[in-house]
Amino acid sequence: MHQVILCTCPNEASATQIATTLVEEQLAACANILPKIKSVYRWQGKVEQDNEYLLLIKTLETQFQPVKERIQELHSYDVPEVIALNIQQGNKEYLDWISNSILL
């Protein structure tokens, strides 16, 4: 099954580094960087707000663990967001491209 993994980053440089590494290492076929999202969350008992960058990482379900581990190695957050959403349907040619772009 194909997946989109969500990961927030503190800045564009961090998002670009993680995205580039995952694609270069063929853990992901593609990663989109959405700029300047606003996150509201609870951290250490306080409600926080930050501007962040959101990665949309296209990969395969079998690659979730290696992608998660690589993000944790590269990320500056103590607890980085790494959430996978299964792709139920999509353009077959695009999904085939994802499959063929990942090193298994």
Feature roles, as predicted:
Residues 1-104:
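Positively charged, small/polar-rich N-terminal and surface patches that mediate targeting and assembly
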